[in-house]
Amino acid sequence: MKKNILENKTILLGVTGSIAAYKAPLLVRELIKKGAKVHVLMTKSATEFTTPLIMANLSRNKVIVDMFDAESQTSGAWHIELAHNCDAMLIAPCTATTLGKLANSICDTPLVSVAIALPTEIPLLVSPAMDSTMWIHPATQRSLELVRQDGALIIPPVEGDLSSGFVGPGRFPDIEDIVTVLEETLKNSSETRYETNVTYSKNDNIINNDDSPLNHIFDNATEPIEESISKDKWNAELDYELLKKKSNL
């Protein structure tokens, strides 16, 4: 029987004020179904798209929105305690605002405070979601690169229909794909080295990893060639992120 890597794992889920936050309850439900213990942190903007009550009911844990909420003050440094007692933190969706705060250690929300307090051995996964023009803006890309350099695994957005009515990059990935990336990250972080056959050329940044499960996420899809190309690129970016995480182990 295949081992469920998420069983009894403590996952911190950060939810920010992207319109994609309305999908966050589905993400919580999927993690709970796989046996994870989920603690949700929300920015105040995120509460405009889904409610702490919904997230608390699904996660079966109190949701933290306010840094100084009296019920959250279970210890002198509750955010440190929370950060040091989890198996991974996932910020999904992540806005350009929170991405910028992560890049510059602006800890004015519980979500960012906990993310910055994570020990380096605990994986931080960030799934940005925003409109295309915001995603490709140089400021967003600078923040993205800084967060990446600091050790976070970036789950890149996909191309598709956006809430603005435009079509382009910035769309929140499918829930099952985000969960798969989290599972693979936990699996790899629990090993002293990766067992997959990976080759990397510094000259041309080519990644060749035929054995990676990420390459098979979309194997059974029947879709237009444009979407297939976009998803192949998405998988390649994820493999690259995982390879860089390996080099830091």
Where is each model-derived feature located?
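A cross-family phosphate/adenosyl-ligand binding-site feature
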Residues: 1-126, 132-249
